[in-house]
Swiss-Prot record:
Alphabetical keyword list: Cytoplasm, DNA-binding, Isopeptide bond, Metal-binding, Methylation, Nucleus, Phosphoprotein, Repeat, Transcription, Transcription regulation, Ubl conjugation, Zinc, Zinc-finger
Protein name listed in UniProt: Zinc finger protein 687
Keyword rRNA processing annotated: no
Major localisation: cytoplasm
Phosphoserine: modified positions: 104, 142, 228, 243, 252, 254, 266, 271, 374, 433, 495, 1058, 1083-1084, 1086, 1107, 1184, 1191, 1211
Subunit structure: Interacts with ZMYND8.
Molecular function as annotated in GO: DNA binding; zinc ion binding
Gene3D superfamilies referenced in this protein's UniProt entry, alphabetically: Classic Zinc Finger (3.30.160.60)
Species this protein is from: Mus musculus
Amino acid sequence: MGDMKTPDFDDLLAAFDIPDIDANEAIHSGPEENEGPGGQGKPEPSVGGDSKDREEAAAAENDPESPAEASDHGLPQPPDTSTVSVIVKNTVCPEQSESLTGDSGEEETKAGGITKEGPVGSCLMQNGFGGPEPSLSENPHSSAHASGNAWKDKAVEGKTCLDLFAHFGSEPGDHPDPLPPEPSQPRGGDMAPPPFSTPFELAPENGSTLLPPASLLPQGALKQESCSPHHSQGLTQRGPGSSPETAGIPASVSPPQVAGVSFKQSPGHQSPPASPVKAPSCKPLKEEDEGTVDKSPPRSPQSPSSGAEAADEDSNDSPTSSSSSRPLKVRIKTIKTSCGNITRTVTRVPSEPDPPAPLAEGAFLAETSFLKLSPVTPTPEGPKVVSVQLGDGTRLKGTVLPVATIQNASTAMLMAASVARKAVVLPGGNATSPKTMTKSVLGLVPQTLPKAEVRTGFSLGGQKVNGASVVMVQPSKSATGPGTAGGSVISRTQSSLVEAFNKILNSKNLLPAYRPNLSPPAEAGLALPPTGYRCLECGDAFSLEKSLARHYDRRSMRIEVTCNHCARRLVFFNKCSLLLHAREHKDKGLVMQCSHLVMRPVALDQMVGQPDITPLLPVAVPPVPGPLALPVLGKGEGAVTSSTITTVATEAPVLPLPTEPPAPPTASVYTCFRCLECKEQCRDKAGMAAHFQQLGPPALGSTSNVCPSCPMMLPNRCSFSAHQRTHKNRAPHVCPECGGNFLQANFQTHLREACLHFSRRVGYRCPSCAVVFGGVNSIKSHIQASHCEVFHKCPICPMAFKSAPSAHAHLYSQHPSFLTQQAKLIYKCAMCDTVFTHKPLLSSHFDQHLLPQRVSVFKCPSCPLLFAQKRTMLEHLKNTHQSGRVGEEAVGKGAGGALLTPKTEPEELAVSQAEAAPATEESSSSSEEELPSSPEPPRPTKRARRGELGNKGIKGGGGGPGGWTCGLCHSWCPERDEYVTHMKKEHGKSVKKFPCRLCERSFCSAPSLRRHVRVNHEGIKRVYPCRYCTEGKRTFSSRLILEKHVQVRHGLPLGTQSSGRGGSLARGSGGRAQGPGRKRRQSSDSCSEEPDSTTPPAKSLRGGPGSGGHGPLRYRSSGSAEQSLVGLRVDGGTQQCLDCGLCFASPGSLSRHRFISHKKRRAGGKASVLGLGDGEEAAPPLRSDPEGGDSPLPAPGDPLTCKVCGKSCDSPLNLKTHFRTHGMAFIRARQGGSGDN
């Protein structure tokens, strides 16, 4: 909302947008706000928040003669938008929840226009609570709406004004008998009517009764009824102490008047002067309990609240109320102001738990019966006269303006807004700016009560009328949803965030409301609705429902909230979608309450230039755990789009598309409809397709159905087995999508064009917000940025804080002697309670949570968009690319590339490495930046596949099971030369002598191909680690960079580096690229992917420990290790600490450093041989060489073996660092039998 742009309602720019509260008012509600006694507290700013608006509103109340009052309903009808309001409110502390509800209501009432001269209450409902009847307004033209009942003493003013209640007085010709006086009126006019049992009676002119005698209506029941959703439609105006049926007749009226119904009068209708309301007293009247059935001692006077106390009472029975079910007692003070107006204020008194008023249901029924009398016709009608039949036979007549132009509940809501605007902001003799009117309207649009929404509902114009208020609050206690921890909690100090949020929702769109052409050509045969498909939030209308869906899917901002009803973290990309979600709760009778607001801008390239993809059918996706509607973020070559996933309980299989030309009858075999994988018999072709597409357990001996050779996730073991044979080109050629058995000549064509099998990909669903991402890198970045909390930990004590200033203040107050120290950043996992000190550890920890979150997504063959459902992708192909199954030439030219190729989409290449490993696009960076591999390492598969690629792919391979598959036409070539010829002849592409089997790249030499496969497809990088950096493993992409780093950072000459380390710096140079050395290198490389643990030993190279330091640095004992390390590191008198890698000029300096920093004292022994000083203790090596030596691996029972995953480490420090990557939550789950390795 906030985008309504109807020209005649520019001055109402937010009347049906955010009528509840303004940005300046969203953060001021607190128990410290106090007002003066008697309801005349300090005037608060109206919704706009400036004093000028208050003065203008007061002037509007004091001067009833306004040029704009000529017509009560002279405004044209804007688009019908049932108002849905969103307010971000604060909570101070949980124990103040009860007081906060009252205070917030007070502020909202004041924002709605209460002034010293004449408070105008508003029956707003904030934070899920309905407000009580507001105080009285002296504006005579205030139609009966939720902004307060407007009535005044016209005898005092001496003017002939529009009296809303004149028609309900006794007419001499009809009912000369007056009403008997009330039995109990303690002070002048306050009513305390007894309970009643007369049925409700309300009669039109014919005299049939529908309303009960108003003199017998208890105030508690009437007040409890006053905030029903029907009056939020603009039909009646309620006042304090009056029911919806009899709203507006004061409690202090003379005997001929009752607390009866207040109806909207026809424009310009003058009330007869026979029924002015005279206030009997100008001093504050006696306070008495009128809000509840039971009586209790009055409480001390508190601030006037015309919006919260009775709201609490009403919300006690509401399903959405978070407070206790105790009925709230209120007392109403009637005060005659100096100008002759009577003002009522409502204050809350303590009450004991008692049953609510038993006759509220009857009030609801009577209200419903009355509202059904208002006809809804497309043409204007004259005033309708209705009469109230009282219990003693007295009949009161009144004129009701028919709801003639209200087509649905939204327009009724707008009518209420327009009348409320006139009731408050139209001054006499002064021109009021649209801004002032708008600010007043924001506080006066009527709200609804959840209880009434649940219990009643009525039909108006053939449509269901519901309330339209939505409250977005910060609950007193944190939401229990899975995403509660993520995001920043709104507090009083975050007023700028709340203000920005309200400004966004209240902002006026500079563009006019879109109106489509609803007159299509006759030959189109389109049946369009009369008003098109309209967004109820902003008023834009569209010709097609798909256009409306795209309108809701546009990306203009990122709003994250925690919906307390859904108990989940939700992400919205525009305010219309946010308010649409609120409307869904409203339609169920609930009031949306949210917390933990986080707003972020959306990048320009993600905001524009991307087609909005929405599902056009309620299509099926595999029934995975998750919400019913969630956005999909597909990433491919920078394109990001959003979509909507609709989960359907019964999944309909997607049948193959018809081929052009049609396939011959012998192309496929569908004779027996028996699954060739599991021998299950199916009934027909659709049953066979459903058998292959339904979710099922993984294949035997496998933990998932993710193909290790291509980035594809299959639904079940039958589909997985059939897909595996497509890589080996073995019979039977069974389609993994539909289960058909095909001939080899037609198999690839069927997979490519009919079933679009190669469009499957692996996606990852965020466990916190259920957003689906196309790559593991993107979801890890999303979780770290959106859901993980970062704390500033005190370096002295275990305290941690959310902000650096708080940590600094803690240091200043608690540890004044350590002010020079800085707080440490720690990172908390959003999916468990594990805390990490380094981001790489947290990123590695995510792998354990993301394995169960893998889902199957579908990539468009012609563009980089991803879809959660195959049917949605087919609709996208049909509507966007205009050819259904786009020719696969476009696939090769577009971003899709070879569908079996993981290189075209780096974020999804991870599956080919380890079923969910991170992408290798950062493979050239240091290991601090690279992401760790998956905890499922299928290393035997890697070795086997790498052997195929390294040998057969280079030597030609014969016709082995490897072969080459064309990424453009998916044709399979057993020989390398045949593949090169095919690419040049069929597609005009020049391919080098050594093409890669997993992507389109080709190379001139076999080593280049092997390096490409190792780095890009297996994720095993050839890195050059620095053995002198012990605080963190530093790796480099080339030997030259490593040597420069050692020379500059550690001060070692280049000669020592080259002579001492030889070929062991590079993990296998070109001279040792083949043979056993390559296998050793692969083993060590595959173990070096984890950034925070050292690699386990493998085998020893030539030149063992005693080769004078020219061999690799893997030793059987710490003494031999230190001897060789010192021989390498000490050159020209330079001493280096073996614990931290720092270099020193003398052994004495090194000794002092080791004693001060590492607490290692001198000890006799071999230290002198090591050059460490006399008697200095030799530190054990903290780092080990990845090349591997002949030192044995730790035994399974060795204390250096990880008890969780069995990984062996060579030092307790490395074991401890590695063990922290698992997290305690993961370890507990594994010990309980629910975790995966």
